[in-house]
Swiss-Prot record:
It is found in: Nucleus. SUPFAM superfamilies: Homeodomain-like (SSF46689). Its main location: nucleus. GO terms for cellular component: nucleus. This is Homeobox protein Hox-A7. Pfam families: Homeodomain. It comes from the Eukaryota. Belongs to the Antp homeobox family. Residues 89-105 have a biased composition (Acidic residues). Keywords: Developmental protein, DNA-binding, Homeobox, Nucleus, Transcription, Transcription regulation.
Length: 105
């Protein structure tokens, strides 16, 4: 901990970064079980994995910001996706945590 009570910035090895990026390529969101597996495999904490993914999603969002503003054609026979209240709660919790992490940096 530094004089301000915050932890220092985590640096990841090339191997850890490569593995995290590889996982992110296939899934932008992790299940808790998968986060535990990755944390164990990379000798990191679940919290470090969670925060890395939150930060990486924000980076991805910024990189793809322009793409999402372009009008997209939706086929007339497209079926709207169905999300449960639990999914919505999880998404809101993730967004709140991302905002908290950004404030900490």
């Amino acid at each position: 901990l530094g004089p301000d009570g915050k932890r220092g910035r985590q640096t990841y090895t090339r191997y850890q970064t490569l593995e995290l990026e590889k996982e992110f390529h296939f899934n932008r969101y992790l299940t808790r079980r998968r986060a535990v597996e990755i944390a164990h495999a990379l000798c990191l904490t679940e919290r470090q994995i969670k925060i890395w993914f939150q930060n990486r999603r924000m980076k991805w969002k910024k990189e793809h910001k322009d793409e999402s503003q372009a009008p997209t054609a939706v086929p007339e026979d497209a079926v709207p996706s169905v999300s449960t209240a639990a999914d919505k709660a999880d998404e809101e919790e993730e967004e709140e945590e991302e905002e908290e992490e950004e404030e900490e940096e």
